[in-house]
C-alpha cells in the first residue's frame, strides 16, 4: 500500500478540513504530518461547525485511527480544550487518537517568545498567530526541544531547563510578561495528554501499510507558506509541501501514492506578506463577505484576490499533484467576469514562472473569462454545471496540466461534486 497526501496549494485556508472529511471513508488511517494550532481546519458535520487545530479531521469517522505525527508541534493546553470540546459533542477520541512521541511540545514560554520577537521586529513583523510555532521549531532545529515522549522520562528537568533558557532570552529582550495562567493551563494539559496513546508513529504508519491499510496524510496551511518554497520570510516554520509527509511521519518517498492538491476558485491570504493578485476594491470585499473569509483560529479578516495560476502551477510542480480539488466555486456565482493571473510583470518583463522573490514589484497579468451567474450551491452533479463554469474548469486544467477531480459548491460535505466518475 501507499500513502495518499492531501495538502493546500495556496496560502492556506483552502478548505482542507472539509475535503479530508469527505475522503476519510475511503481510508483506514488519517495522519497529520506538520504544523500546529496556528492553523484551523473548519468542518461542518451534521449541521454543526467544528474547527480542528491539532487533531486530524478523520476523528468524525468512528472507525478510523487518527495519528498526530512527529512533524507536528503540540500545545497541551490548546489540545486539551480542543479534545474536550470534541468529546463533549459526542466524538470520543482517546482510543482512536495516537500521538507521536517525537512530536515537539509548544511550551508556555514559546508563546511569550513569539510575541516578544514580533514586537522587536516593529514594522518588519511577519504577522504570526502568536501560538509559539516559530520558537518551537527553532528549538527543534537547534536540538533544544521538549518532545511528547519526554513527558514519560525526566520531564521536570527537561521542561525546567528549556524554561530557564527562554527566560534568559526574554530578559535580554526586556520583554515584560506573566507566565502564571499560561503555565497553569499548560500543566493541566500535560496531565490530560497522559490519557492518550503515545506511539512511535513512524513504525505504526509503516506497519499499517505493510498490513494493507490505507493511509491519508493531512497537511496544514499551504504550499505558499512552506519554509523553503513559500513567499519567504512571510512563511510558516515547517515544510507544508508533499515532502513534509515523508519527514513528518517517517514515510519513504516511494510510498507516496496520490497527491491531492486543494485550491480555492480565487485566492486568500491572512496576515502579512506578498500577494500579487490582492484586490483592494469592492470586488475583494465582496469575495471576503460571500466567502466568510475570516481566520478560523485568529478571526483575522483574510485578504482576497483573483486566482494566481503562476503560483498555483509552481505548487502543482513542487508537490507532484496528481488530482486537483477546487473549493468555494459558489463564492464567484454572482460575478460577471472572472479573472485569472496567467503571468507576472517584473521590471517591465513578463514572466510565467514563480520567481525567487515576490515581495515587491510584481504586477499580475490577467486573462478574463465570463462568469456563470448561476447558484451552484444546489447542484448535485457535474451534468448541472453551466457552460461558463465548465469553460473555467477547462481553462484551469489546461493551465495547470492536472485534472480537477472534485469541485466544492458549499461548506457542507454534501455540497461536493466528483468529476470524471466514469473512469
From Swiss-Prot:
Keywords: Cytoplasm, GTP-binding, Ligase, Magnesium, Metal-binding, Nucleotide-binding, Purine biosynthesis. Its cofactor is Mg(2+). Binds 1 Mg(2+) ion per subunit. IMP binds at residues 13-16, 38-41, 129, 143, 221, 236, 300. It is an enzyme of class 6 (ligase). GO terms for cellular component: cytoplasm. It catalyses: IMP + L-aspartate + GTP = N(6)-(1,2-dicarboxyethyl)-AMP + GDP + phosphate + 2 H(+). Its main location: cytoplasm. SUPFAM superfamilies: P-loop containing nucleoside triphosphate hydrolases. The keyword Cytoplasm applies. GO terms for molecular function: adenylosuccinate synthase activity; GTP binding; magnesium ion binding. It comes from the Bacteria. GO terms for biological process: 'de novo' AMP biosynthetic process; IMP metabolic process. Mg(2+) binds at residues 13, 40. Substrate binds at residues 296-302. It is found in: Cytoplasm. GTP binds at residues 12-18, 40-42, 302, 408-410. InterPro entries: Adenylosuccin_syn_GTP-bd, Adenylosuccin_syn_Lys_AS, Adenylosuccinate_synth_dom1, Adenylosuccinate_synth_dom2, Adenylosuccinate_synth_dom3, Adenylosuccinate_synthetase, P-loop_NTPase. Its EC number is 6.3.4.4. Pathway: Purine metabolism; AMP biosynthesis via de novo pathway; AMP from IMP: step 1/2. NCBIfam families: PRK01117.1 (NF002223), purA (TIGR00184). Belongs to the adenylosuccinate synthetase family. PANTHER family: ADENYLOSUCCINATE SYNTHETASE. Plays an important role in the de novo pathway of purine nucleotide biosynthesis. Catalyzes the first committed step in the biosynthesis of AMP from IMP. Homodimer. This is Adenylosuccinate synthetase. It comes from Bacteroides thetaiotaomicron (strain ATCC 29148 / DSM 2079 / JCM 5827 / CCUG 10774 / NCTC 10582 / VPI-5482 / E50).
